[in-house]
């Protein structure tokens, strides 16, 4: 048999795996093979001999006193008197090891070992792929549609060598049906990795176009200042297909974060909006002062004042600004609440008209120098 260390090195190189991880799985495969061949009730151990570079597999028995009930209840123990028949020098508490050579056990044993090795190496590959893609959650990917279910509820994709899917809830539904997400087999779709699932069948990647992370990823792809870390997306909230709000921070006073994201004549923000089926994107500058943040997040409405009371923001507006503050179907006030983390309560205030006396004074001041 080829030296086990050579086999481990070969598998590690071929599968691009860490040799230490492969070694661990190979030892596990040998132990599982022993349990299949001889029974799980026995204790087995294995290690790789540094001199021969081969694996040593053995059954282990712990020496106990002749009157110890463990010897009758478990096959992992042997009485002292029986142990001395094998080795006169043993004492209670010692371990006796029986070497097992799977090669000497015939074709069935070799086939069992081969299956165990394949099973454990495939599991290792799945785990590494899972770790790799799980670390990419929130990242933008391009995926090709391979099939669509009969009711158009789920899209299926090829992503590198893995399979992905996108349920209907993860696709953008616009107020204008003509703008909503519609894909056919063969289409290339931009989305983010929302979740990575692993089971005995393999790895399945859930994609999404409705997550706020998708908007953040698109902005990073369109705006160099975000990609380079000069502008940070501090908060992001979406009502997919309708409206979104993004709060930005510039790490340098020389950078206008809103101008950087909007782009010349709106080219950058329009490109992102187009990918989001025409979703309107409000861009504001983040502030650590809650009153300022709420005021900015309520745009395009003009706010008279804001009072913060624990988790609630009391927003005072003129009646003329109420419809803008609420937004179509409540989108503006909902997004403001999502991005600021405050419950928004609107209060109308009466516009104060100048008195006749004040109006006369203002008029006189205009003509006093004539």
What is the meaning of each model-derived region?
Residues 1-370:
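RNA-contacting regions in translation and RNA-metabolism proteins
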